[in-house]
């Protein structure tokens, strides 16, 4: 009988994968490690690391500046750049990023104030009044025409009555559609953008944005990673080529256990989430560099179908998820055995649940090794907090 393959794309010595026209974003973002304590040297150092440590060759191509670059507004309302953190402004930083063959990303808020101006200690109070509200057209022209950024993340702290001192309470859908119109008005058709509303915003987001946050902010703890995965298990209907559920920036390489790092990265890839590294690229802990440069897992994330994995079986606290790759309803599947519990699990799936029949060739994507040919059922042992793909 003809073999049907349960695997990711079978990769040759060189990495080649057909990408969707607008695959999930890959790159690095400043917030997880630096918060608002950023400057031009920090950003350039991360760009250098991305270009020289193998990340660019694996498809990572964005350097994103999150909150912390703001310097208030002048008397005419023009947005200013922080004079100490970026003494020469942002355009030289963007030009430097571009000179390395990378794309540059920036941050703003849908309301009047940024998140760092309200949350955390100490607060970055210079972010007060620097949000987009009342300045959509001029700020987008600044970011995309004058400063030549390629991506923007738009937060919502300053537009939610629960998260800003002014109790400004804007209509989420209307507000983000106004922002989408302002981006379009710049004339740039190569700009991508992210809605950051900390929960799935609604199907309207799928029509206007490239990605949208579906959960609260990630933080450096297994409980955070587990919570985000749990909230993402049943959102596959809302992902499509060019439009993705964003599970937030990666905490891989910052101190989770090896199994937790593998689950974190692997499940983000299964879900076709943007892959934005959050650690210092020059100080990656453990085996995380090799993990984040696993081209077989990256191929799963960047697969041209742009689909998100969905649950086919749940048992004893674990979940089995499947994802079509290369061809919808074809002969390849990527399957994740996800164990969020505190004990090891023996997990299995019948090939009939994956719409596969006959002999099935199996490959382990973490090990990057063929595991043989199976028929009927695949069983694996998965450690606590672990995943096998």
Model-derived regions: residue spans:
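Boundary at the C-terminal end of the N-terminal hydrophobic targeting segment
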Residues: 18-20
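Aromatic-lined carbohydrate-binding/catalytic grooves of carbohydrate-active enzymes
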Residues: 42, 46, 50-165
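Carbohydrate-binding surface patches
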Residues: 268-271, 276-278, 314-356
């Amino acid at each position: 009988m003809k073999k049907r393959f349960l695997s990711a794309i079978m990769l040759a010595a060189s990495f080649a994968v057909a990408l969707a026209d607008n695959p999930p974003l890959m790159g690095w973002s400043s917030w997880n490690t630096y918060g608002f304590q950023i400057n031009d040297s920090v950003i350039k150092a991360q760009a250098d690391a991305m270009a020289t440590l193998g990340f660019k060759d694996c498809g990572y191509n964005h350097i994103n500046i999150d909150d912390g670059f703001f310097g208030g507004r002048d008397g005419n309302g023009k947005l200013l750049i922080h004079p100490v953190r970026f003494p020469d402004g942002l355009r030289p930083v963007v030009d430097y990023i571009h000179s390395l063959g990378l794309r540059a990303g920036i941050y703003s808020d849908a309301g009047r104030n940024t998140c760092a101006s309200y949350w955390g200690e100490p607060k970055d109070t210079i972010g007060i009044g620097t949000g987009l509200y009342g300045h959509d057209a001029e700020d987008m022209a600044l970011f995309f025409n004058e400063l030549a950024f390629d991506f923007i993340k738009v937060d919502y702290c300053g537009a939610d009555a629960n998260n800003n001192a002014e109790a400004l309470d804007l209509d989420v859908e209307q507000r983000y559609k106004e922002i989408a119109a302002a981006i379009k008005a710049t004339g740039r058709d190569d700009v991508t953008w992210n809605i950051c509303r900390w929960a799935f915003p609604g199907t309207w987001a799928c029509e206007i944005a490239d990605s949208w946050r579906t959960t609260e902010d990630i933080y450096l703890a297994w409980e955070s990673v587990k919570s985000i995965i749990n909230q993402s298990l049943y959102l596959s209907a809302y992902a499509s080529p060019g439009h993705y559920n964003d599970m937030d920036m990666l905490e891989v390489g910052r101190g989770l256990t090896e199994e937790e790092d593998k689950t974190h990265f692997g499940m983000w890839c299964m879900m076709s989430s943007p892959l934005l590294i959050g650690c210092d690229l020059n100080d990656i802990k453990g085996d995380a560099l090799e993990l984040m440069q696993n081209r077989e897992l990256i191929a799963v994330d960047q697969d041209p179908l742009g689909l998100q994995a969905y649950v086919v079986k749940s048992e004893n606290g674990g979940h089995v998820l499947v994802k079509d790759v290369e061809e919808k309803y074809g002969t390849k599947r990527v399957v994740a055995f996800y164990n969020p519990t505190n004990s090891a699990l023996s997990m299995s799936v019948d090939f009939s649940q994956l719409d596969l029949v006959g002999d099935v060739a199996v490959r382990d994507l973490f090990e990057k090794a063929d595991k043989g040919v199976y028929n009927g059922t695949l069983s694996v042992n998965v450690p606590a907090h672990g995943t096998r793909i």
